[in-house]
């Protein structure tokens, strides 16, 4: 290995690991870079931003956290509603075997609902929704021995608890003590948050001693377990959210509690959010917590330049330039910077393609698609700063990890599930990918995969179709080759090619390194059936055959438009293991392979071919309009997540004693006087311009009472 490559890899790995200091890659001046402005300098953002509950709370990570802090510290009466929403989220991503008990717990604590606890085995009783029936099938399918044993243990414990509860309810009825209920939160030794604890009767009929409960139950909002405490068996009266729910909603929940359906609390959630979007949100808008939100938004809107980042080794190259690793100086977070050379873009007339890719990346916020964090320009290039994927691409892992090419079925199934989720997220936004292949599916540090390189993606208006012969030879669908109109069907054909290649170790219509003309590959795609070896089981073969159908009408995933991914996810190929789709989307399932954190899954620096200099192209004033549209700086959700993940939010988001405003949050604060010193002739340190108070228009000191401020996104 060349010395240049060794040095480049060493520096890059050190940056990835957070450096050798306690700042974890942050600049020594990071606090100065992220210093809050005085509130008077950013309160005018109220006129420019979407100040609605649906945006500030539902979509903005920092807004959501500040609203939580406001409710917890200033208006505890509202915190019960936040806790209810948190518990419903935990409920929705739980396995069916635990969900029924958690549902009963939520019903008792927040809705004052009691229902006889019953086991459901997929038949009889309450009608189960499609997803719940699917999970029951998964739970009864061929899981590994450990999972099966855990499930059996859980079911046995469930049966015992069910009998205990029913007997308890009968005895309570006979003794006419309706307010004394049996708490079954820890039916298998775990509470709703997964913290281990045990519940034992202390002899008092009206209370049970519970240990290890999360802070949310105490009104604290944290997730760590606390010490032991005594809780009324019927739950806390001050946890009830009945005042914002009508009797019909509560009755619907009562009737469905034993079904374990994922959405039984959905309408209650909407009602609670509608309440929070009213008076609670208006109170929040008048508080220092909302002013702190405006300060964060001011920082988020600051110009982004090349000085924002440190640049490291080249990782690869694209059509318009190279991709290199970079690190944000203020936070230490690593990204991949895709540099698009201005002259090369202009020479190839790729302005429209570049802008579409940028706009699509900015629109998508998915854990299965690389996210855009920043978009900025330099003198010579347009730069997209994206999620860095340190684990390499699937093509590398299929062919270059030693042994026989391809993956075992379980690993292929896991990657296929995550890619299917990514395609579904794109399709829901009306975006067709058009370039699904192993090179474009990247692994992160933890072994999860994401879709990358959206250069060929295009947005399709509702009910319309597009035409375009674009893609990669051997992965293009027959309708693309024939230049016919299509919607989302090409993505599911390419997905079938990807799944086939992961299992077989070669593409379905072209052998690895086979020298064959493009026309011959296109003919095979349109006419030849693919061949299946013993590596495929019946479910895998069936799925590939349905995905690789020549006719759109017969192809899996192509019958329900933007929601075609649901048909793909419902295929038996994904039923032969305990795959919980919501836990997958929440990143709670363990990947089958974790990349080596000390390895660089990229070509040597000297092996990455460099671009030649573009000649005969000049950049002039006519190009500035395009560059202005591109250069939009930080992407809101990605930037806020970065602040929280790197703990910048925790370290900077401090208030005064007893939750009082700090000087930068005091509306009528006077300028800080100069400190007197021993040397009057010394050079005075100027107060940073951003921290100096300025006059505030009166209308900005009142809350917004527009309709948008109470809009809740369902």
From Swiss-Prot:
Catalytic activity entry: [G-protein-coupled receptor] + ATP = [G-protein-coupled receptor]-phosphate + ADP + H(+)
Active site: 435
Annotated Low complexity bias: 154-175, 698-714
Residue intervals of the AGC-kinase C-terminal domain: 577-642
Disulfide pattern: none
GO MF, one example: phosphatidylinositol-4-phosphate binding
Keywords: ATP-binding, Developmental protein, Differentiation, Kinase, Membrane, Nucleotide-binding, Oogenesis, Phosphoprotein, Repeat, Serine/threonine-protein kinase, Transferase
Domain of life, per lineage: Eukaryota
Biased segments, Basic and acidic residues type: 176-190, 199-220
The enzyme's E.C. designation: 2.7.11.16
Disruption-associated phenotype: Adult females show severely reduced number of egg chambers and the small germarium in ovarioles. The rare eggs that become fertilized display gross defects in embryogenesis exhibiting fusion of adjacent segments and holes in the dorsal and ventral cuticle.
Sequence segments annotated as region (N-terminal): 1-308
Residues recorded with modification Phosphoserine: 612
Enzyme class: transferase
The keyword Iron is annotated on this UniProt entry: no
Matching CDD domains: STKc_GRK4_like (cd05605)
GO cellular component assignments: cytoplasm; cytoplasmic side of plasma membrane; plasma membrane
A GO biological-process term: signal transduction
Pfam family, one: Pkinase
Domain RGS: 53-174, 177-294
Residue positions binding ATP: 315-323, 338
Localization, UniProt: Membrane
Tissues where this protein is expressed: Expressed in all larval tissues and in adult ovaries. Larval CNS staining is localized to axons projecting to the optic lobes and the mushroom bodies, in the longitudinal connectives, and in cell bodies and nerves of the ring gland corpus allatum. Adult CNS staining is detectable only in cell bodies and processes associated with the ellipsoid body of the central complex and portions of the mushroom bodies. In the wing disk, expression is confined to a stripe that parallels the anterior/posterior boundary of the wing blade and the hinge region, and weak expression in the prospective notum.
Family under the similarity heading: Belongs to the protein kinase superfamily. AGC Ser/Thr protein kinase family. GPRK subfamily.
Role: Specifically phosphorylates the activated forms of G protein-coupled receptors. Required during oogenesis and embryogenesis; component of a signaling pathway that functions during egg chamber maturation.
Name listed for the protein in its UniProt record: G protein-coupled receptor kinase 2
Organism per entry: Drosophila melanogaster
This protein's encoding gene: Gprk2
């Amino acid at each position: 290995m060349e010395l240049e490559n060794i040095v480049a890899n060493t520096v890059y790995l050190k940056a990835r690991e957070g450096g050798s200091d306690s700042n974890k890659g942050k600049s020594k001046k990071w606090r100065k870079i992220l210093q809050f402005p005085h509130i008077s300098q950013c309160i005018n953002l109220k006129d420019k931003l979407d100040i609605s509950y649906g945006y500030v709370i539902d979509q903005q990570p920092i807004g959501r956290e500040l609203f939580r802090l406001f409710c917890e510290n200033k208006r505890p009466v509202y915190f019960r509603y936040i806790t209810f929403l948190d518990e419903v989220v935990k409920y929705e991503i739980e396995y069916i075997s635990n969900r029924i008990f958690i549902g009963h717990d939520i019903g008792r604590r927040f809705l004052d609902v009691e229902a006889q606890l019953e086991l459901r085995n997929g038949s009889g009783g309450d009608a189960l929704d499609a997803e719940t029936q699917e999970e029951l099938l998964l739970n009864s399918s061929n899981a590994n021995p450990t999972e099966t044993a855990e499930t059996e243990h859980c079911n046995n414990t469930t049966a015992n608890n069910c009998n205990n509860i029913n007997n308890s309810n009968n005895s309570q009825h006979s003794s006419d003590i309706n307010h004394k209920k049996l708490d079954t939160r820890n039916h298998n030794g775990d509470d709703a948050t997964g913290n281990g604890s045990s519940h034992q009767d202390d002899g008092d009929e009206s209370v049970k001693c519970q240990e290890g409960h999360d802070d949310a139950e105490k009104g604290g909002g944290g997730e760590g377990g606390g010490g032991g405490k005594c809780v009324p068996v019927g739950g806390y009266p001050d946890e009830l959210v009945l005042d914002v729910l009508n009797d019909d909603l509560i009755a619907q929940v009562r009737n469905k509690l034993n079904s374990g359906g994922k959405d039984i609390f959905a309408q209650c959630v909407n009602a609670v959010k509608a309440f929070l979007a009213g008076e609670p949100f208006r109170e929040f808008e008048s508080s220092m917590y909302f002013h702190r939100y405006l300060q964060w938004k001011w920082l988020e809107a600051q110009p982004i330049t090349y000085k924002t980042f440190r640049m490291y080794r080249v990782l690869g190259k694209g059509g318009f330039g190279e991709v290199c690793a970079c690190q944000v100086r203020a936070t230490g977070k690593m990204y991949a910077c895709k540099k698009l050379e201005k002259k090369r873009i202009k020479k190839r007339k790729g302005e429209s393609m570049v802008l579409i890719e940028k706009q699509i990346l900015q629109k998508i916020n998915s854990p299965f698609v690389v996210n855009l964090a920043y978009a900025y320009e330099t003198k010579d290039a347009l730069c997209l700063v994206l999620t860095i994927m340190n684990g390499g691409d699937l093509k590398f892992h299929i062919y270059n990890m030693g042994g026989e090419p391809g993956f075992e079925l379980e690993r292929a199934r896991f990657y296929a599930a995550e890619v299917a989720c990514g395609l579904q997220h794109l399709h829901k936004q009306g975006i067709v990918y058009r370039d699904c292949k192993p090179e474009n599916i990247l692994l992160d540090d933890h072994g999860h995969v994401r879709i990358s390189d959206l250069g060929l993606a295009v947005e399709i208006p509702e009910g319309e179709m597009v035409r375009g012969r674009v893609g990669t030879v051997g992965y293009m669908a027959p309708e693309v080759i024939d230049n016919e109109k299509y919607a989302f069907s090409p993505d599911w054909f390419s997905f079938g090619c990807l799944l086939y290649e992961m299992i077989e170790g070669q593409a379905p219509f072209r052998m690895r390194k086979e020298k064959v003309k493009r026309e011959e590959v296109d003919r095979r795609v349109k006419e030849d059936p693919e061949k299946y070896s013993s590596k495929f089981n019946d479910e895998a073969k069936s799925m590939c055959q349905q995905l690789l159908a020549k006719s759109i009408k017969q192809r899996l995933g192509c019958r329900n438009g933007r929601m075609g991914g649901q048909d793909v996810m419902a295929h038996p190929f994904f039923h032969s293991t305990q795959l919980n789709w919501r836990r997958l989307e929440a990143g709670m399932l363990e990947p089958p392979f974790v990349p080596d954190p000390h390895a660089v899954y990229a070509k040597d620096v000297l092996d990455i071919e460099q671009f030649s200099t573009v000649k005969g192209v000049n950049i002039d004033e006519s190009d500035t309009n395009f560059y202005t549209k591109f250069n939009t700086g930080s992407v809101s959700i990605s930037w806020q997540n970065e602040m929280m993940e790197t703990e910048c939010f925790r370290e900077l988001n401090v208030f005064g004693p007893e939750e009082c405003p700090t000087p930068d949050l005091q509306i009528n604060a006077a300028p800080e006087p100069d400190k007197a010193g021993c040397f009057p002739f010394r050079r005075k340190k100027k107060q940073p311009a951003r921290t100096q108070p300025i006059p505030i228009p009166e209308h900005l000191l009142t809350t917004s009472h527009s309709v948008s401020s109470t809009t809740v996104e369902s």
